[in-house]
Amino acid sequence: MDTAEEDICRVCRSEGTPEKPLYHPCVCTGSIKFIHQECLVQWLKHSRKEYCELCKHRFAFTPIYSPDMPSRLPIQDIFAGLVTSIGTAIRYWFHYTLVAFAWLGVVPLTACRIYKCLFTGSVSSLLTLPLDMLSTENLLADCLQGCFVVTCTLCAFISLVWLREQIVHGGAPIWLEHAAPPFNAAGHHQNEAPVGGNGAENPAADQPANPAGENAVLGENPDAQDGQAEEEEEDNEEEDDAGVEDAADANNGAQDDMNWNALEWDRAAEELTWERMLGLDGSLVFLEHVFWVVSLNTLFILVFAFCPYHIGHFSLVGLGFEEHVQASHFEGLITTIVGYILLAITLIICHALATLVKFHRSRRLLGVCYIVVKVSLLVVVEIGVFPLICGWWLDICSLEMFDATLKDRELSFQSAPGTTMFLHWLVGMVYVFYFASFILLLREVLRPGVLWFLRNLNDPDFNPVQEMIHLPIYRHLRRFILSVIVFGSIVLLMLWLPIRIIKSLLPNFLPYNVMLYSDAPVSELSLELLLLQVVLPALLEQGHTRQWLKGLVRAWTVTAGYLLDLHSYLLGDQEENENSANQQVNNNQPARNNNAVPAGEGLHAAHQAILQQGGPVGFQPYRRPLNFPLRIFLLIVFMCITLLIASLICLTLPVFAGRWLMSFWTGTAKIHELYTAACGLYVCWLTIRAVTVLVAWMPQGRRVIFQKVKEWSLMIMKTLIVAVLLAGVVPLLLGLLFELVIVAPLRVPLDQTPLFYPWQDWALGVLHAKIIAAITLMGPQWWLKTVIEQVYANGIRNIDLHYIIRKLAAPVISVLLLSLCVPYVIASGAVPLLGVTAEMQNLVHRRIYPFLLMVVVLMGILSFQVRQFKRLYEHIKNDKYLVGQRLVNYERKSGKQGPSTPPPVSSQE
């Protein structure tokens, strides 16, 4: 047993003295049990923690006050402290008001007024700009528009910085680094090596000079490589060695400048924080940042909006296309894009001239500007134009499904062009996203090397920006055209053709009912809540759907492989083929067949370096059967037939099942087809889920199946009880309470009787319950948060019905019932006993719910102010009379850290 002489501090390893005694403030024992208070305070300052890092026990300090401290603080001390606190609060209020006014008022308003001034196109607007800045006309609208302008300029600035980093770290194109013409086929050929078709002639295809070259939506035409090779030879003959050396020197100098800038930025970043930049630290340095932001906004508006717009405008006016552009309802956007295209052409010409006269710095600057414009245009095409084309094509091919015509779409576009274009762009983005997701699923099933012509999104080296920087523009245009053809053909196959077949076979099935208003007796809000809260989470949040789809794809692939003798080509061989000579014969194909390249060579190895999410998978060889092209053609035909049948099933079965089920609820009334389709999909999902579970249980025997059915039946019963309580009773009571407290007093006059609709109250209650649950989970720890977290942690399979009812459902329902019943009892039972008039009884009955809510809110505010005053009292007492703090020893018997004390401080007085 340790003695007092052997007790040493865990930090300084010294013994205790009368001046510096040892304490044992936490659960730790042995040689780390004791510590000096000074050592602990120093360590807390260093570690910035308030608890022991070993036992997680929170250290406790007891305050030491001056002996002359009175039992109660004098009124003058409290008043002085209160005045000081109010003064500090006012100072901070003024400062934060100035910060908000600067960032939310001055910056966006200045950006909007400057933007309008530049695009007005008159000299008078420039002369009256200072007065326009101070104008209060359309203040709120200009601030909102200015916020959008500032956001655009900020995104442009961040994109420029990011593009610079891509050029610095990923390397600039060869034609920019060397003194060669801008259309340097040698540079392009080297950067495009991983994308070409002739893998056997390009053994360096796997070099990572341009990993983004693999990001092709569709495969490139291998015949184009011959022309590129000829251009490469010509450009190599014309290359100037002296120009290369000068360009290299200029590049080194530019690299030194970039390194110096990086050091300066790092040095500035050490001093600059978000609080200091925005002015939240209490200083006025942010005013300088406001000035620089306004200047940056003006510069970016002038360079990236004003100049391209006017270049495009003057060009369109000169060519006589101004009327056609104005008829599109997007004159500004189209004119700006035309300006960027003309600017890119001008930069190419100037770059070529600078190369001829050997102005290397100017040549590099023009090349970088061309890259910026080129990447910007490609981003607009990839993210804006392509999804928009897909969305419009989907709409055109599905007109008969909704009993619409092109005239209807034209009228909707004329009435709301912005909304129409956005909706079509959104539909196109969803289509592209799910198409890419399906391709990823195919890569997990098929043999590596089958889908070499599709972009590999799982490749960690995939970088679309590097691809935009390095590949020439004609490659992007060719890829864009091929992508449009393929995506459009898939829409024809899976949408337009099934609709024609459905109209021929089931003439009364179409069109779908997509009217905005329904004559159904059921509230649309209730149906939307069921769709959002029940159906969509089950269809989207479950991983079973993806596994089912993957299993179907694998089954189809196996079937097609055995029917067409393409199992080796589609899925690969399970075991190694002993006849390696046959492998070489089967896999060594002419250049026009890109699928026939030996393992580890050429295009396939480059494209299939990483195919699946699990990690890298090499290219796998396959056995090539006789009549291979014919079998591939039959495979494509079989695939098209399968996709057509699958599309027919998806367009008819869920809607038919949903209409049949909803007819029991809504009768013969027509409702939106979204609800019927969602209901049918949910029923189909439940059916498939039940079938798959039963199939998985079949090998385990009848007894195990009965046991599983019993367990699942019990779990379903518990879940239904919990759902009735938490998803039925609680939302209904909550919605009814909200109706009585907020909606009825505001919307219904006193001389009218409010009407309550249980379905609408329940739907609103579901929303309110979800909001309250989310706020509770984000808030501090208290009993409701603890219970909800425990219920979430248990899940459905480990559901504890007794715990949920006792800890969650019963308390919440009791509080809601008391909130509903107590005011009603007071208004209907107690008030009439007082002998008041009928008008007063009606007034009390209608206003007692909001009145009691105000009383509860006032009591909460009063309680909060009392706690704040106690904190202020303690703060004043500590400032005036606190002389130090003493560490509290850990008491093992009570298991608690000691009396309630203020939090530990980082210094000792």
From Swiss-Prot:
Effect of a null allele: Marchf6-deletion mice are born at rates much lower than Mendelian frequencies, with peri-natal deaths commonly occurring. Mice that survive early perinatal mortality exhibit growth retardation and/or postnatal lethality. POMC-Cre-mediated Marchf6-deficient mice exhibit hyperphagia, reduced energy expenditure, and weight gain.
Enzyme class: transferase
Cytoplasmic topological domain residue ranges: 1-91, 164-283, 358-376, 443-480, 541-631, 699-720, 785-814, 869-909
Disulfide bridge positions per record: none
Keyword Zinc-finger: yes
Disordered, as annotated region: 186-256
Keywords: Acetylation, Endoplasmic reticulum, Membrane, Metal-binding, Transferase, Transmembrane, Transmembrane helix, Ubl conjugation, Ubl conjugation pathway, Zinc, Zinc-finger
Record-linked Gene3D superfamilies: Zinc/RING finger domain, C3HC4 (zinc finger)
Spans within the Extracellular topological domain: 113-142, 305-336, 398-421, 502-519, 653-677, 742-763, 836-847
Metabolic or biological pathway: Protein modification; protein ubiquitination
Modification after translation, per record: Auto-ubiquitinated, which results in proteasomal degradation. Deubiquitinated by USP19; protecting MARCHF6 from p97-mediated proteasomal degradation.
GO terms of biological process kind: proteasome-mediated ubiquitin-dependent protein catabolic process; protein K48-linked ubiquitination; protein ubiquitination
Catalyzed reactions per annotation: S-ubiquitinyl-[E2 ubiquitin-conjugating enzyme]-L-cysteine + [acceptor protein]-L-lysine = [E2 ubiquitin-conjugating enzyme]-L-cysteine + N(6)-ubiquitinyl-[acceptor protein]-L-lysine
Cell compartments where the protein resides: Endoplasmic reticulum membrane
Transmembrane stretches, start-end: 92-112, 143-163, 284-304, 337-357, 377-397, 422-442, 481-501, 520-540, 632-652, 678-698, 721-741, 764-784, 815-835, 848-868
Binding residues annotated for Zn(2+) 1, in chain numbering: C9, C12, H36, C39
Modification type N-acetylmethionine: residues: M1
Tree of life domain: Eukaryota
The UniProt record lists the keyword Cell membrane: no
Physiological role: Endoplasmic reticulum membrane-associated E3 ubiquitin ligase that plays a critical role in mitigating endoplasmic reticulum stress, the regulation of cholesterol and lipid homeostasis, and ferroptosis. Acts as a pivotal component of both the Ac/N-degron pathway (targeting the N-terminal acetyl group of substrates) and the ER-associated protein degradation-cytosol (ERAD-C) pathway (targeting misfolded substrates). For instance, mediates the degradation of Ac/N-degron-bearing proteins such as the G-protein regulator RGS2 and the lipid droplet protein PLIN2.
Subunit-structure text: Interacts with DIO2. Interacts with SQLE.
Domain notes: The RING-CH-type zinc finger domain is required for E3 ligase activity.
Name of protein: E3 ubiquitin-protein ligase MARCHF6
Species for this entry: Mus musculus (Mouse)
Gene: Marchf6
